[in-house]
Amino acid sequence: MSGRRFHLSTTDRVIKAVPFPPTQRLTFKEVFENGKPKVDVLKNHLVKEGRLEEEVALKIINDGAAILRQEKTMIEVDAPITVCGDIHGQFFDLMKLFEVGGSPSNTRYLFLGDYVDRGYFSIECVLYLWSLKINHPKTLFLLRGNHECRHLTDYFTFKQECRIKYSEQVYDACMETFDCLPLAALLNQQFLCVHGGMSPEITSLDDIRKLDRFTEPPAFGPVCDLLWSDPSEDYGNEKTLEHYTHNTVRGCSYFYSYPAVCEFLQNNNLLSIIRAHEAQDAGYRMYRKSQATGFPSLITIFSAPNYLDVYNNKAAVLKYENNVMNIRQFNCSPHPYWLPNFMDVFTWSLPFVGEKVTEMLVNVLNICSDDELISDDEAEGSTTVRKEIIRNKIRAIGKMARVFSILRQESESVLTLKGLTPTGTLPLGVLSGGKQTIETATVEAVEAREAIRGFSLQHKIRSFEEARGLDRINERMPPRKDSIHAGGPMKSVTSAHSHAAHRSDQGKKAHS
C-alpha cells in the first residue's frame, strides 16, 4: 500500500459533469410575461430538474384547463400536422420529440393522450405541454388518454410524484384539467384520431360529439372504449365474424375487428383511424389496408422510446402534409435517475443494512453456547426457562434476518425490473409466498407473480417482446377500491357485450 490518501467530498457530486438541480423554484414573475408562460424559460429550468413555486404550477394547469374546457369533445384539426402517441412521463424524450417533429411555434401538433404515469417526469410533461397549449391554443391539441384519470394515476406513479415534487393540491388541479381534455379529433375530415379506438356504442362521429366528457372515465361504455379498446390480436385475419370481443388484455372494453373498423370508416366517409395506447417496437404500426380505399384501415403511433427503460423500442411521430404521410422515428435520450416509487436513498438502503445487522447478531449469538449466556448466580430451576427464552430470541432474530433478506431481494428485483413494477414493490408473495399467500392473493397479484416468478437479477431483458410479456399485467385496468367491477356495472358490461353482438349480427346481415 502506498501512503496516498483519498479525499472524498461530501458536497461535490461523484460525477461532476452532472450538475445539481436548481434549488430555487421559479417565481410567477420569472415564468409569466403578458399573462402567458415563457416556454423557453420553463424548458431550460425543467430540463435541469428545477421546480416551480406552487402558485405558478397551479396557474399553468388552471389556465390550460380554461382553454381545454372551451373545446369540443371531438375537435376538428387541419393538416399539415404532427401526430404524437403516448409520452408516459418521459420528459427528456418529449424534448427529443420536438426536435424531430419541429418547433411548436411553427408546427401544428396533435397529442393522443397518456402524458403521465410510469415515467418519473410526468408533472414536467404536463406543465410544459399545458404551457405550449396556452401559447398556441389553435395549433397544439391535446386529447385524453386512459391514464389521464384519478383511478390510474392513484394506482401508478403520478399521484405520488405530485405529492413529492409539489402537493396534492397540484394533483387535484391536474385531475380537474384532465376532465376537460377532448376525447377525439377529426383530422382533415379524413382521419379519426383517438387514444384507444372503437366502441360498439359509437357508429357515427355524432355519437362522439354527444358524449359528456367532463367526468372521471367510467369502467364501461363508449367513453371507456374510446380510451381503452384495442384492435384484435389477429386484426385483419380474424377467425370470428364478431365485430367486438371482450378485451382480455385490458380487463375492460373490447377488441375491435378489421370488419368493424372498415364498416365504421365506410359509414363515416373516412380513410383511417389513428390511435396510440400500445407500445410498438418500431414506434408505429400500419394495419391491413381497407379494400375500399387501399389505405391502412388503422395506424398505431407510440412516442415513448425505450419505454420504462426496458422495452428498447423506437418512438415515432406521424407527419401529415399535402396528403402525404411520413413517419419519423427517434431513440431515447439520457435522463436523470430516480429510485423506484421516488424513494430516497436512506429508505432504500434500510433492507440492505438491516440484513447485515441481523446476520451479525445471529452469528454473535451462535458463537456462544446456552450455558455461556446464562449467568452463574441464576437459580437452578429457572435455567431451562432461560434457555428457551434465549432460543426464542435467536429464532426471532433469524426470522427478522429472513425478512430483511427478502426485502433486499425485492429491492434489487424492483431496481432491475424498473418500470415493470409501477408501484415500486413486487406482487405479494413473489419471493416468499406460501399456501396462505396464494389463497388470499387477488387475481391480479397472482398473474403478476407468475409473470415475473423466477426472474434473475443477472438476467437482462433483451427483447421488446420479453419486456411486453413481463409488463402485460400492468396493461390491465387496476382493481378499483370501490369494487366497481362487482355488482351493477358488470351487468352493464354484459349488456354492452350483448349490444355489441347485436350490432355484429346486424353487420353480418348487411354484408350477406
Swiss-Prot record:
Which Gene Ontology molecular-function terms are recorded? calcium-dependent protein serine/threonine phosphatase activity; calmodulin binding; calmodulin-dependent protein phosphatase activity; metal ion binding
Name what cofactor the protein needs. Fe(3+); Zn(2+)
The main location is: mitochondrion
Q: Which PROSITE patterns match?
A: SER_THR_PHOSPHATASE
Q: How is its activity regulated?
A: Activated by Ca(2+)-bound calmodulin following an increase in intracellular Ca(2+). At low Ca(2+) concentrations, the catalytic subunit (also known as calcineurin A) is inactive and is bound to the regulatory subunit (also known as calcineurin B) in which only two high-affinity binding sites are occupied by Ca(2+).
Tell me where in or outside the cell this protein is found: Mitochondrion
Q: Where are the transmembrane segments?
A: none
Name the record gives this protein: Serine/threonine-protein phosphatase 2B catalytic subunit gamma isoform
Q: What is known of its domains?
A: The autoinhibitory domain prevents access to the catalytic site.
Q: Which species is this record about?
A: Homo sapiens
Q: Where is this region: Disordered?
A: 471-512
